[in-house]
Amino acid sequence: AVSRFTHIPGTQIVALCDYDPKRAEACQNILKKASMPKAAIYSGETGYEELCKRDDIDLVYIAADWLHHFPIAKCALENGKHVAIEVPSAMNLQECWDLVNLSETTRKHCFILENCCYDWFEMNTLNMAQNGVFGEVIRAQGAYIHNLSDFWDYYWKNGENDKLGWRLEFNMRHRGDVYATHGLGPV
């Protein structure tokens, strides 16, 4: 996620945050490779709160575990930051409305980074449809299947305090269909 921002001209990455300080520190290598200065590191359960209080941050990009997307976004908006959130942006309808209302109240942008709407395949298909390659499109259907078998070891929870094993539980609870926007968004 950090490497994406290093390719945007004029972007400065002044702070990084992860529950695990080693993971945040590892991102310094990405900045170094892009000839960017080191960023301040924040970590722990509430490290994002300190990051959001900084005056030199315009945008907080959130790529945390899903349960933390909303509280981090809320904190960032309340501290006058624009917010970009990987999907899902919230875990229930109330949190969605809270983000909408906070964004409107603070006059700060809050947007979902739905990569399955703007990735190469989706944009190529849109271009083909707009150029008549398929004729008149009268119906479309979307689906999303994500084979995560290569990542099961990473997603498996190794004890009660393991912060990285969160995703497998969501996949089991929701029949593996955890990204409704991935299949529906491009349609």
Predicted ranges, named:
Residues 106-111, 116-187:
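Predominantly a Rossmann-like dinucleotide-binding segment in NAD(P)-dependent oxidoreductases
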Residues 28-32, 103, 129:
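Conserved hydrophobic residues forming the short capping helix/wall of the S-adenosyl-L-methionine
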Residues 33-41, 105-109:
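A short helix-to-beta-strand connector/capping loop
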Residues 59, 65-66, 70-118, 132:
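Beta-strand-loop-alpha-helix segment that lines the small-molecule cofactor/substrate pocket
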Residues 15, 59, 139:
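Short, Asp-centered acidic motifs that coordinate Mg2+ and/or phosphate
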Residues 1-34:
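N-terminal Rossmann-like dinucleotide-binding module
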Residues 39-59:
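A structured beta-alpha segment of the ubiquitous adenosine-cofactor-binding alpha/beta core
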Residues 5-8, 54, 119, 131:
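Acidic-histidine catalytic/liganding microenvironments
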